[in-house]
Regions:
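Flexible, surface-exposed loop regions and adjacent strand-edge segments
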Residues: 58-60, 94-101, 149-157, 203-211
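Predominantly the C-terminal beta-signal and adjacent terminal strand-loop region
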Residues: 87, 181-233
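Extracellular loop and loop/strand-boundary signature of outer-membrane beta-barrel proteins
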Residues: 28, 50-54, 97-107, 155-162, ...
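Transmembrane beta-barrel strands of outer-membrane/channel proteins
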Residues: 40-46, 80-84, 134-140, 176, ...
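Gram-negative (and chloroplast) outer-membrane scaffold detector with strong preference
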Residues: 25-27, 70-153, 220-233
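Short glycine/proline- and aromatic-enriched beta-strand/turn motifs that initiate or cap beta-hairpins
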Residues: 24-71, 145, 224-233
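Residues that define the transmembrane beta-barrel architecture of outer-membrane proteins
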Residues: 36, 58-64, 107-113, 130, ...
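Cleavable N-terminal export/targeting peptides
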Residues: 1-34
Length: 233
């Protein structure tokens, strides 16, 4: 009988030794928590800009910028960005025939500052290194550098010249961040900006617009694709 009890205890002990490693194993999670809550980034891209029906506004551009981000907790972050659009525009003289109004092409560089709420779709975690997101917000844009040389040479009246001015901008975007390491990450983003183009007051003179076809203003979009790198801290 003691021999039987000893044999039973030995079997139970052996089973326990076999099961212990298996019970200690854990299935690795595809999600990794992101510890750092602040981020500084630089980005470059290309922008497809709508110049408007009268083709007065800025056109396609090379785009550069910088961004500061801070996490607010959970899935929400704030992005504060400054973006430079290195663009061109068609310089038009409304006093000339409609098929001969364009007298030249000039540079126009725009600066855009905006603040956006970012919704991280995986929260404060990344999935296999990826963290997809959506953003929305607003800001303002204004010209940083404008080439008016052709207008001066053509002696265009000031009321006939297009001026971008300071414009409110609406912004939305979507993309994903790929975390290369705990602090370094890459980000690809498709962005849509919305702003208003205003027609110069001189264009509404009777001799320039006898049929009253010109609109006073028009909302246009800038569609951009951005690639950037950021450092988290």
């Amino acid at each position: 009988m003691p021999h039987t009890k000893f044999l039973a205890l030995s079997i139970l002990f052996s089973i326990g030794m076999v099961r212990s490693p298996a019970s200690a194993q854990t299935i690795p999670s595809p999600y990794t928590y992101i510890e750092n809550h602040q981020e500084l980034a630089f980005f470059v891209g290309k922008s497809n800009i709508d110049a408007g029906k009268l083709e007065l506004g800025p056109r396609d551009s090379d785009t550069f910028g910088a961004r500061y981000s801070v996490g607010l907790g959970g899935a929400i972050s704030i992005d504060i960005s400054g973006t430079l659009f290195k663009s061109t525009r068609l310089i038009q003289d409304v006093r000339r025939p409609i098929d001969d109004r364009t007298i030249n092409r000039g540079n126009i560089d725009l600066l855009l500052f905006d603040a956006r709420i970012r919704l991280n779709l995986t929260g404060r975690r990344m999935w296999h290194g990826f963290q997809p997101f959506l953003t929305f917000g607003g800001g303002f844009a204004f010209p940083y550098l404008v080439d008016n040389g052709a207008e001066e040479v053509a002696f265009m009246r000031s009321e006939d010249r297009y001026v971008f001015g300071v414009r409110f901008t609406g912004t939305t975007s979507g993309g994903t961040t790929f975390h290369v390491s705990r602090k370094l990450s890459l980000r690809v983003e498709g962005m849509l900006n919305l702003w208003q183009i205003k027609t110069p007051i001189g264009w509404f003179a009777l001799e320039n617009d006898p049929l009253r076809l010109f609109s006073e203003s028009e909302w246009v979009t800038a569609q951009s694709i951005m690639l950037g790198a950021s450092w988290r801290f």
